[in-house]
């Protein structure tokens, strides 16, 4: 049995080749791989001894030869193939261990030149992988060091890899070369100024019971790159499988949680926050978020950016929740929450750098692509456009409102007091309609605890500008004292004048946050 080695990623290759030699395999290798194995004391056949031809063109041509590809592609079950190979002095090759030049890593360098990129386009490697993968019934093709141990184990047990394993490895090899070619094609088309083509690469993570509704099928695919605050990398500690709607809502909750450094909690339903708050600690944040809307949070999803301890777990336990997400749970908290068998507990890494990614929306005949709305401006006093200026406590609430309203379906209005939402108006076709919903919710919440809304000096946030002054007029009727909005309307002056007339401070951020 003969194995051909030509690897860029040297991880575990010496041990793998050594074990094959112990099992009676001959090792053939190219250039740097051959030197590495020989330095480790292994007997290695130079590929040039097989081809009878030296490496040429600075190593660009090494394995592109009939004695390599004939040995890989020749069928062991066809006498005509066997005869042709024998006639031409070609021996079978039973395994190929190849991974490709690091093209992805090369072009990730912002200073990469075209020459650097070109020299890291592998030609012989993909050719060998494809030839070996085509003849998978007889040839083992290895492109991932993670498979080395499994291959050695099977050879020890049966003398060769199983047919099932070879088929799986063949599929992996074709996937590897397809991904490689997609990267090269994307780079070269951009360099040539050609029309962009979009290649998407995701792995199936989970087949879901159904989609948004029971009559819709659904699957969850995950990106190959690690994404911070990601459901794809979350560890589920308890509970039944996540549903399509669970994943949508949980992702929305995590995107809100990433906005805050202070202890924060959000309850969410149908991708809109129903209660959100910052607090002195996780218990305080939970209490404020829960009190914000005790009705809507029923059956909702909760995300917390601090460890869940026993105290907050006991407060959450009586409430029917679908999911609780946090960076960690104490053992005592897990003991409390595990008694609710259907409650899903997700441990999510929230410590990584907050990066953005592209968002895709499917439609008939195509998809829309946009960058994630990751940037949020910190609300500062110099954004004020009215005669009345904000105090420090108002600035804190204005910034909180601005970070929350960004994640509410447009038209979006939130009403805030002391670092907590009191009302959320989402998805209405006119802005004043959303404002009315949010203000009525806030009034009801305050009335429940014996407070008058007009005496509280509330803060209002809007994801879009005010086309008319009607939203400011309505806000003033409910006692709102500070407003944050993007600005940019042709009638901004009307809203500013109305705010001045009503003694309201208004800040314009210059950044809109529509969410459809």
Report residues per predicted region.
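Short gly/pro/ser/thr-enriched loop/turn and capping motifs at secondary-structure boundaries
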Residues: 33-36, 51-57, 103-105, 127-130, ...
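Active-site/ligand-binding-proximal alpha/beta "capping" segment
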Residues: 76-126, 130-132, 383, 387-392
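Mobile "lid/hinge" segments at catalytic clefts and subdomain interfaces of large enzymes
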Residues: 128, 135-148
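Hydrophobic beta-strand scaffold residues
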Residues: 27, 44, 139-141, 345, ...
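ATP-dependent carboxylate/acyl-activation modules
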Residues: 1-5, 95-98, 180-516
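Glycine-rich nucleotide/cofactor/substrate-binding loop typically near the N-terminus or early
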Residues: 32-103
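N-terminal glycine-/serine-/threonine-rich phosphate-binding loop
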Residues: 1-50
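Non-catalytic interaction/clamp surfaces of large macromolecular machines
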Residues: 146, 150-198, 319
């Amino acid at each position: 049995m003969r194995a051909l080695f030509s690897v860029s990623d040297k991880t575990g290759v010496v041990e793998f080749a050594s074990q094959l030699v112990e099992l009676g395999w001959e090792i053939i290798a190219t250039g740097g791989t051959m030197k590495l194995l020989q330095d480790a004391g292994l007997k290695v056949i130079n590929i040039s001894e097989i081809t009878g031809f030296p490496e040429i063109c600075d190593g660009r041509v090494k394995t592109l030869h009939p004695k390599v590809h004939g040995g890989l592609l020749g069928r062991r079950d066809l006498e005509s193939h066997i005869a042709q190979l024998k006639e031409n002095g070609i021996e079978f090759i039973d395994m190929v261990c190849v991974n490709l030049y690091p093209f992805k890593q090369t072009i990730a360098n912002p200073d990469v030149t075209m020459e650097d990129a070109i020299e890291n386009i592998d030609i012989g490697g993909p050719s060998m992988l494809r030839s070996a993968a085509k003849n998978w019934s007889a040839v083992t093709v290895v492109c991932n060091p993670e498979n080395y141990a499994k291959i050695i184990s099977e050879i020890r047990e049966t003398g060769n890899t199983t047919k099932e394993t070879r088929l799986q490895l063949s599929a992996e090899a074709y996937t590897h070369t397809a991904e490689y070619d997609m990267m090269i094609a994307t780079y070269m088309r951009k360099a040539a100024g050609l029309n962009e083509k979009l290649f998407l690469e995701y792995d199936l993570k989970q087949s879901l019971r159904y989609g948004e509704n029971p009559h819709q099928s659904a699957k969850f695919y995950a990106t190959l790159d690690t994404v911070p605050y990601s459901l794809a990398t979350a560890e589920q500690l308890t509970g039944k499988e996540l549903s399509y709607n669970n994943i949508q809502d949980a992702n929305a909750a995590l995107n809100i949680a990433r906005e805050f450094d202070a202890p924060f909690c959000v309850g969410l339903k149908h991708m809109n926050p129903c209660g959100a708050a910052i607090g002195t600690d996780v218990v305080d944040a939970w209490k404020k978020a829960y009190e914000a809307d005790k009705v809507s949070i029923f059956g909702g999803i909760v995300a917390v950016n601090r460890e869940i301890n026993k105290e907050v777990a006991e407060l959450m336990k009586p409430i029917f929740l679908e999911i609780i997400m946090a960076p960690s749970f104490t053992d005592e908290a897990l003991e409390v929450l595990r008694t609710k068998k259907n409650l899903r507990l997700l441990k999510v890494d929230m410590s990584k750098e907050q990066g953005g990614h592209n968002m895709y929306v499917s439609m008939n005949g195509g998809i829309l692509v946009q960058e994630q709305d990751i940037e949020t401006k910190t609300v500062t006093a110099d954004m004020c456009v009215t005669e009345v200026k904000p105090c420090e406590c108002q600035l804190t609430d204005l910034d909180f409102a601005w970070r929350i309203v960004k994640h509410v379906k447009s038209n979006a209005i939130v009403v805030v007091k002391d670092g907590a939402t009191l009302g959320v108006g989402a998805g209405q076709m006119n802005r004043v309609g959303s404002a009315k919903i949010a203000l009525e919710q806030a009034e009801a919440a305050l009335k429940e605890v014996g407070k008058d809304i007009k005496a509280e000096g509330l803060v209002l946030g809007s994801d879009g500008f005010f086309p008319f002054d009607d939203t400011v007029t309505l806000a003033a009727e409910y006692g709102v004292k500070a407003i944050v909005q993007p600005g940019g309307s042709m009638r901004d002056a009307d809203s500013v004048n109305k705010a001045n007339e009503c003694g309201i401070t208004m800040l314009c951020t210059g950044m809109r946050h529509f969410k459809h």
